[in-house]
Amino acid sequence: MSSSFKSTLKVWAYLTDDIREDLLLESELVLLSFATGIQDAASWSDYGCFASNQTGNGLFLAIGAAKLEGSAYSLSHVGMSSLGAFLAGGWAVGQIGNLVGVRKRLWLVASSAFQTALVYAAAAIQYNLPIPQGSPAALAGIFLLAFSSGAQVALGRSLKITDITTAMATAAFIDVVADPDVLKIQNRQRNRRVIFLLMLVAGCFVGAFAQAAVNSTFIIILCAVCKTIVTFAFLTNKPIEKLRR
């Protein structure tokens, strides 16, 4: 067997390893949570809906349908582009992950790279085209961001680190305050939830202030940069130790 073939086998074995749950994996999910906060600050200000917070979008959809705020909340943005794309992204990545192995390194890298590419594409649309609400460019932008968000949440949930959802904060807030061991010094679950919430909220603040100081294109690129870091970081995660026979 040639040395080049052996090297290829080693690389393939490395890429098909199942990665383990550790501090690095948790840190990657926390960084994705930060990116989510940044992204939703941009999507709300430009599109009048969220790319990730579908609970909020459900409320906006009802308000818009009842005409409580006139045409402030668009069915095309909230219902078709954001909620629909979010579900489509979650379904696609969730089901493919079930088939190929949700912890496979190659799957995590490829899926994360795809999600990141969608965010960069949304930034390109934002930079090059006008995006009045209801325009094709606006619908395309929110579709890309929401599809990427749904895929990200599905990827994160499939890793079974339920304390870090990368997007939804409501349950995490209650999990923290209702934890019977909330005041214990050593409480890994509480710590993960608190860090997740802090990073998600911090991302929202960063996105909001960056929107005020620069523009939404910059915010979306910043989100994409965070996701790029995570994509490459997946290459460094340690594998689950295989049992020796």
Predicted regions and their residues:
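Alpha-helical transmembrane segments and their membrane-interface boundaries
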Residues: 2-167, 188-204, 208-244
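Cytosolic, membrane-interface loops and tails of multi-pass inner-membrane proteins
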Residues: 165-182
